[in-house]
Every structure is written in structure tokens, then in C-alpha cells.
């Protein structure tokens, strides 16, 4: 192996994709389940340069002949370069997190910063906060140690913090939807930054957005930025425009990983447009109504007849939760999916939501759609749901002409969203 990543579990890592998009060299993922495996790997030194992730960022320091002062102060190395058999250790997580904060306008000078978690990434984010002039840095733990000045989550809400950094795995795939901090009860918050990058928006970030926090951002750009700065050490040269490389690779990752969820009235064209989008983008198409039928074994009209709309909506929510946390899918949603806020959150956590807008007079009446029994029922339904579609959507796609025109409009909207 010339270049790669070592760590305990690497199944969900984006690092191979990032480095190969960035520099074109082969980059391998090398899971090392035990400490003995890691020590044997480091003793062999059969690599040019590697990244290091949990749980070996401290252990690797034992094998380094040189450790960058910043990495030594933080107590963790995530980048190792082999120079004629001598290992040189650096910490580009610091650079990646500093880039993330700067790129999104997170002001730290004079602020009170709240860091959730006490693991290794805590030290990295703390170093950035202090170096950028934070007035106070507070630590939050599920099991706080008063002697260390740590706060409970209940105490954190009353801390008066302006900035929150999450360094815990709370809300990380596949255990999404987890959040221990009540950001809605912290009216002075200016920024919430989560180092978790999968899903794109954790429950913490979604709640911060709901609470109107001016800056709420996940960790994808940090991941990319630390990789860009690691590659500079790998290759022994600087990129002409490192921030530009970060933007380019981040956009490419968003384009590859974010789901595309189509919402709108029954018969507005979600399924037809979804098939075309999936084919054009080379993605799997998931029709959520079909998944409900597969899971339940009954048709949608039969589910409505037996359990009513509430029974159907519960089954729908289960399928949206199932697929919403995955990546790289086109999701065709039922017309009423937006009626439950939990569904919208599940779609937005790792996806882009497109509202397929078709005039109510052009919608089909009857068929296998229990709530579309008449033109009047459709008009009433559209009036009730339209505000929900608009609130959920990242973009509105007019479907008043041909499907080809709607497809082109959807692609244009997606290009703008992914590159933003």
C-alpha cells in the first residue's frame, strides 16, 4: 500500500473517494481491528503516507520520529508520512475544522464555545476555538466530572454559549435521529457545528435550523479539507488553491451521496420523473409506495380500508425512515408524505427535496389513490398540502410541459444545489 487509511472500522469512510478524486493516486482502506494489528502494521512501515482514524490517533504517535508541535499539543496524529523509514506525524483535523469554521463564517473571537464530548476530536476543536480567540471553552459530557469543570447537557442549555461544537457520534449513521442538546432553549446561539458528516445533517443540525440558528453545518467539508491538507503532506507540495479544491471535492461528494427526494400531489409525475432521473444519474430508484406494499403485503387501498389513513401514514413513516438515512438514491414519495414533520426531517437529513408542481386540474382522479376520489377532493387536498410541499422543498420543479422539460429543470436545480 502506498497511500491509505488505517482505523478500527472503516466501512462508511469517504476517504478513498476523496483522495482519488483529489489526486488520482490509489488510496486503500485498511481496517485494523485490534491494537496488535495496528502495531504490526506500523512496525512494518510498508507505505508512503497514511491517514489514521479512531482508535489509533494516539497510538501512532509512539512510532513517529517527528511530531508536528500542533499535533503534539492536541495529543493526536491523523496524518503520517514515511520519509526513508522515519515516520513524521501531523494533525490535519485541526486544519480541516478551522477551514470549516472560516468557510461558514463562524465567529469565535470573544465567544463562549460549548463542546459536546470528551474524546479525541474535543481537543482538536478546543485548540481551534482557543487559537481563534474564544473567551471561554466549556465541555459537555453525559457523565460530567465536576473536578474538570465539565457540564451536563441540562447545564449546557443554561451556559450562555454562542457557539456549539459536537464531537460525539450522536446522530451518526446508522443511528440517526439522536440529539441530547436542546438547542431550541438556547436563544443566544450563533452557530452549531457538527463534525459528523453522515448523514449530511444530523438531528442536532436539523434542530438548529428549526431554531433559526444563523449557522448550522455538518462535518463533510471538514472531512474534505483535512484530506486536502493531508494530501499536501503526502505529496510534499501545496495546492495552488486549497480552498477551491475543498469546494470542488465537497460538491462532488454531495452530488454522489445525497438522496434526491421527489414530493408532490398524487399523479403529479413523481414516479415518471423519478425513473428518468434515476436512469440519467445512474442511481437506484425507490418508490416508497411500492416499498410500503412490499413490507405490508397488502395494496394501499386495502391498507386504507383496514387501518385508515393514520395506519397507512405510520407504515409510510417507517419506510421513509428506512430509506431516508441511506445515500445516493432517488426517492419517489407518496403525496401525503409531507403531512408528518418527522418524514420531512428524514428526507432532509441526507437528501435534497424537489417539489414536483403540476396544476391541480391536470391531476388524475380516482384509480388506486384513496384520497383522490373526486376533483373537489383533489382541490381541497392541494390547498392543504401546497404550503407543506413548499416548506419542505429545496427547489420547485414545474411539470406543466413534457417530462423532458421537467427533467431538464430538475437537473438544473440539482446542479445549483450540489455546487452551492
Model-derived regions, located:
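Phosphate/diphosphate ligand-binding glycine-rich loop within oxidoreductases
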Residues: 2-104, 199-201, 205-207, 211-217, ...
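Adenosine-phosphate binding glycine-rich loop
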Residues: 31, 195-258, 399
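NAD(P)-binding Rossmann-fold cofactor-contacting core
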Residues: 132-149, 289-291, 295-296
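Rossmann-like adenosine-cofactor binding region
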Residues: 148-216, 337-343
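NTP-dependent small-molecule kinase module
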Residues: 244-255, 260, 276, 280, ...
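ATP-dependent small-molecule kinase phosphotransfer cores
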Residues: 290-345
Amino acid at each position: 500500500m502506498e497511500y491509505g487509511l488505517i482505523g478500527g472500522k472503516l466501512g462508511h469512510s469517504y476517504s478513498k473517494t476523496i483522495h482519488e478524486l483529489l489526486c488520482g493516486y490509489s488510496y486503500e482502506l485498511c481496517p485494523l481491528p485490534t491494537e496488535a494489528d495496528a502495531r504490526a502494521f506500523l512496525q512494518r512501515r510498508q507505505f508512503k503516507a497514511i491517514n489514521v482514524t479512531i482508535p489509533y490517533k494516539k497510538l501512532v504517535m509512539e512510532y513517529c520520529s517527528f511530531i508536528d508541535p500542533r499535533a503534539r499539543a492536541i495529543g493526536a496524529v491523523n496524518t503520517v508520512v514515511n520519509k526513508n523509514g522515519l515516520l513524521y506525524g501531523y494533525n490535519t483535523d485541526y486544519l480541516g475544522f478551522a477551514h470549516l469554521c472560516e468557510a461558514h463564517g463562524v465567529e469565535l473571537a470573544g465567544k463562549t464555545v460549548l463542546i459536546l464530548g470528551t474524546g479525541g476530536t474535543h481537543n482538536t476543536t478546543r485548540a481551534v476555538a482557543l487559537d481563534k480567540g474564544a473567551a471561554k471553552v466549556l465541555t459537555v459530557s453525559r457523565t460530567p466530572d465536576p473536578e474538570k469543570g465539565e457540564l451536563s447537557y441540562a447545564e449546557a442549555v443554561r451556559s450562555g454559549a454562542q457557539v456549539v461544537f459536537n464531537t460525539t457520534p450522536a446522530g451518526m449513521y446508522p443511528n440517526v435521529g439522536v440529539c441530547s442538546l436542546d438547542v431550541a432553549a438556547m436563544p443566544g446561539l450563533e452557530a452549531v457545528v457538527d463534525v459528523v458528516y453522515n448523514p449530511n445533517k444530523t438531528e442536532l443540525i436539523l434542530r438548529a435550523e428549526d431554531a433559526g440558528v444563523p449557522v448550522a453545518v455538518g462535518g463533510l467539508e471538514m472531512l474534505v479539507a483535512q484530506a486536502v491538507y493531508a494530501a499536501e503532506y503526502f505529496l510534499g507540495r501545496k495546492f495552488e488553491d486549497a480552498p477551491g479544491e475543498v469546494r470542488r471535492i465537497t460538491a462532488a461528494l454531495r452530488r454522489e451521496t445525497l438522496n434526491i427526494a421527489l414530493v408532490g400531489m398524487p399523479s403529479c409525475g413523481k414516479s415518471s420523473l423519478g425513473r428518468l432521473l434515476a436512469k440519467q444519474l445512474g442511481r437506484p430508484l425507490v418508490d416508497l409506495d411500492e416499498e410500503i406494499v412490499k413490507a405490508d403485503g397488502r395494496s394501499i387501498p386495502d391498507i386504507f380500508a383496514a387501518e385508515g389513513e393514520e395506519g397507512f401514514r405510520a407504515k409510510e413513516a417507517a419506510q421513509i425512515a428506512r430509506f431516508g438515512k441511506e445515500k445516493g438514491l432517488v426517492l419517489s414519495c407518496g403525496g401525503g408524505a409531507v403531512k408528518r414533520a418527522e418524514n420531512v426531517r428524514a428526507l432532509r437529513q441526507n437528501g435534497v427535496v424537489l417539489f414536483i408542481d403540476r396544476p391541480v386540474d391536470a391531476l388524475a382522479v380516482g384509480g388506486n389513490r384513496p384520497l383522490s376520489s373526486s376533483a373537489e377532493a383533489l382541490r381541497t387536498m392541494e390547498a392543504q398540502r401546497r404550503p407543506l410541499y413548499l416548506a419542505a422543498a429545496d427547489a420547485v420543479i414545474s411539470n406543466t410541459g413534457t417530462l423532458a422539460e421537467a427533467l431538464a429543470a430538475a437537473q438544473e436545480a440539482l446542479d445549483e444545489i450540489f455546487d452551492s
